[in-house]
């Protein structure tokens, strides 16, 4: 209905103005009315990424991917999070999935593969 999408629209406007606290409340309200609001979960993940809250970011990214396993932006963000956490196996699996489904974020494919390769070479050095 119109009411829920108003929460999402206003949340995006506030997010773009970097008013993360107020936009977070609106995205959460949108989810109350529309538990399948892929965009609200994605924006919440971006807010938690901005706040360095890896736990909440991962929960919201997983919600996006549960609703739409092809969401390349969520996959991209989750690969970066797993690289940050040095979770090699999970990052590799997600990276393979990202390469298969990337649409709007295909330009990020090379960048993310380089980060992944750097992580694996750094791990190899630290294990010697």
Each language-model region and where it sits:
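Canonical positions in the second alpha-helix
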Residues: 30, 63-64, 97-98
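Terminal, low-structured helical/coil segments at or just beyond the last alpha-helical repeat
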Residues: 92-128
